[in-house]
Amino acid sequence: MKHWSIDYSIKYIDGTVKEEQATLEAENITIALGMALGNIRKPMLQDPEISDVVIWGVGIVEDEVFDE
């Protein structure tokens, strides 16, 4: 398993935009993106104060690019 950095922005109904980052553990980038959609974006959109959530970056954690 690798650790994946997920960058996303949250847009609130008042127009405020907040950038966040999370780290997920997944086998590959496709699974990491799916987890981000299901575990980050979908639950946040249920909050009435949030108008949109955009995932704009998914990348492997730098220290794990090459096995030692």
Regions found by a protein language model. Name each.
Residues 1-17:
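Short aromatic-glycine-(Arg/Gly/Cys) micro-motifs in beta-strand/loop hairpins
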Residues 16-31:
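A short, exposed loop/beta-hairpin motif centered on an aromatic-Gly-Thr core
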Residues 27-48:
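A short, charged, amphipathic alpha-helix used as a generic interaction element across diverse proteins
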Residues 9-13, 27-29, 58, 63:
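Generic structural motif
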Residues 4-6, 20-22, 56:
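Hydrophobic residues positioned within well-ordered beta-strands of beta-sheet architectures
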Residues 42-68:
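Short, mixed-charge low-complexity intrinsically disordered segments
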